Design a protein with these regions (language model features):
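Basic, Lys/Arg- and aromatic-enriched nucleic-acid-binding interface segment
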Residues: 43-72
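Short alpha-helical segment immediately N-terminal to, or the first helix within
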Residues: 52, 64-65, 179-180, 193, ...
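Short, basic (Lys/Arg/His-rich) helix/loop patches that form interaction surfaces
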Residues: 134-138, 150-192
Length: 222
């Protein structure tokens, strides 16, 4: 089973980075105030929000946004046959529906490939497709962007502890980008995952590290 193989692989590789989430949460207000980084959630907050979902279609939609960085229009257009889950390194093929700059010769932008490394998400996808008998060319989430926004709003309204920032489906995309930066993902890789034509669009997310330079100042003698 691919999901089991991923679990074993993640356990065998020492790829965890120790991140102080409370400190980053404390810094977020200043980061959002003084930089161009769009509003984002930190990993523990994303987990809290996703765990609050009771409907499996909303749960999977949020997980898909979080794990792939897809725009909501791209996410709700995804059919099962865009996911390749029965391989050693699962991935999803996402058709970029928004791009800036001069279009490439030939017109339509080629789909981008985004790896899926989380075994539990792979299992969730497999289970959802099987349980709901979603045909390979049908959309996983046959809803509109407006409906997706409303479902997320209703979920947040029911939460006892509400997030401290305004959340839309696009927030998951920003949150993945910030999370990838915190975990040391190379910018060209992140650019590819997000489908940015111009890497300067990706560079914006590095500003989340603005307050992570304290240790460099400590080296200086005054």
């Amino acid at each position: 089973m691919v999901a089991q193989a991923l679990t074993t692989l993640n356990q065998s590789l020492d790829i965890r980075i120790d991140i102080d989430w409370p400190v980053l949460l404390e810094q977020r207000q200043a980061v959002l105030l003084h930089t161009d980084v769009p509003a984002y959630l930190l990993l523990p907050e994303v987990h809290q929000l996703i765990d609050a979902a009771r409907q499996d279609n909303l749960l999977l939609m949020m997980n898909t946004l979080w794990h792939t960085g897809a725009r909501i229009s791209e996410c709700i257009a995804l059919p099962p046959n865009h996911f390749k889950l029965d391989v050693q390194q699962p991935y999803v093929s996402i058709q970029t529906l928004k791009s800036r700059g001069r279009p490439k010769r030939g017109g339509q932008v080629k789909p981008r490939l985004v790896p899926i490394s989380d075994a539990s998400f792979v299992r969730q996808l497999e289970r959802f497709i099987k349980t709901h008998q979603v045909k390979k060319h049908d959309r996983l989430f046959p809803i509109t962007r407006s409906a997706a926004n409303k479902r997320l709003d209703r979920l947040i309204e029911k939460m006892t502890v509400k997030p401290s920032i305004n959340i839309t489906p696009h927030t998951f995309r920003h949150s993945l980008a910030v999370n990838a930066i915190f975990h040391g993902t190379p910018l060209p890789v992140l650019q590819g995952w997000l489908g940015h034509v111009d890497i300067h669009s990706t560079l914006v997310y590095t500003q989340v590290l603005s307050l992570e330079t304290y240790h460099l100042m400590q080296r200086i003698q005054f």
